[in-house]
């Protein structure tokens, strides 16, 4: 919608100004541990692990830390018996905005308590499993950065089995996001790379089926503070919400 920022745009704008620049070293390391535990501890044969390693390297995590995380996931790192669980939490923000939280935790009681406190202090509430997840579909999303020839992108998207794509141009950032089914993410990523597109990220993302417009300054401020509080928790890997915010309110609250 013209004049409003979708959730993906909101995330990009926030990360440009957040001191933590998105995910912390600990969060990225945990993603590597879980990926190595779920599949082969070799990135050449484990797409989830390969993607997690690429994100870690982009964030500046040293190779030594990456190798240690892989070893922990494979169970070959001495004196470490920590077991992380992947858990999805659900809740509501101010004005009934639906929020999904993906966490990696070694203590689900601690994580639930931290999330409940963050919600309650900022006008939301942590809900039961299933209360909002029906409002989202999980998709594979590939980020392309830089100038994009739309005709070439359309051709590559069809060849790779993409569902759709969206071009974006924000401030000095231009590029595209390409969407596909979860099971097709690796194939499409490879196709786009072979076609010489500048693929910088491939991830699984929850996409809202419909979005709520936020035009009230106080609601916008409260929502963004809640998102910040949730993202700052060590156990939280990703936060997704189903609101769009008026661009002038977005700039006023992230500047």
Curated annotation (Swiss-Prot):
Keywords: Cytoplasm, DNA-binding, Transcription, Transcription regulation. Pfam families: TACO1_YebC_N, Transcrip_reg. The keyword Transcription applies. Its main location: cytoplasm. One of its GO terms (molecular function) is DNA binding. It is found in: Cytoplasm. GO terms for biological process: regulation of DNA-templated transcription. Gene3D superfamilies: 1.10.10.200, 3.30.70.980. One of its GO terms (cellular component) is cytosol. It comes from the Bacteria. HAMAP family: Transcrip_reg_TACO1. NCBIfam families: PRK00110.1, PRK12378.1, YebC/PmpR family DNA-binding transcriptional regulator. Belongs to the TACO1 family. This is Probable transcriptional regulatory protein PCC8801_2028.
């Amino acid at each position: 919608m013209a004049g409003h920022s979708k959730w993906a745009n909101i995330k990009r704008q926030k990360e440009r100004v957040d001191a933590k620049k998105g995910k912390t070293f600990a969060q990225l390391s945990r993603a590597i541990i879980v990926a190595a535990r779920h599949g082969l501890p070799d990135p050449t044969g484990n797409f989830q692990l390969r993607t997690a390693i690429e994100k870690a390297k982009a964030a500046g995590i040293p190779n030594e830390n990456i190798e240690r995380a892989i070893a922990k996931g494979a169970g070959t790192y001495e004196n470490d018996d920590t077991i992380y669980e992947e858990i999805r939490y659900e809740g509501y923000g101010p004005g009934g905005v639906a929020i999904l939280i993906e966490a990696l935790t070694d203590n689900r009681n601690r994580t639930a308590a931290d999330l409940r406190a963050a919600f309650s202090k900022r006008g939301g509430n942590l809900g039961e499993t299933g209360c909002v997840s029906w409002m989202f579909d999980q998709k594979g999303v590939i980020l392309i950065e830089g100038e994009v020839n739309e005709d070439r992108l359309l051709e590559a998207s069809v060849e790779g089995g993409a569902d759709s794509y969206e071009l974006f141009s924000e401030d000095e950032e231009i590029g595209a996001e390409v969407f596909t089914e979860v099971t097709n993410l690796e194939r499409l990523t490879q196709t786009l790379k072979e076609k010489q597109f500048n693929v910088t990220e491939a991830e699984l993302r929850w996409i809202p089926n419909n979005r709520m417009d936020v035009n009230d300054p106080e609601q916008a401020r409260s929502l963004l503070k809640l998102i910040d509080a949730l993202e700052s928790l060590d156990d939280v890997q990703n936060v997704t919400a189903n609101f769009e915010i008026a661009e002038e309110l977005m700039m006023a609250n992230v500047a």
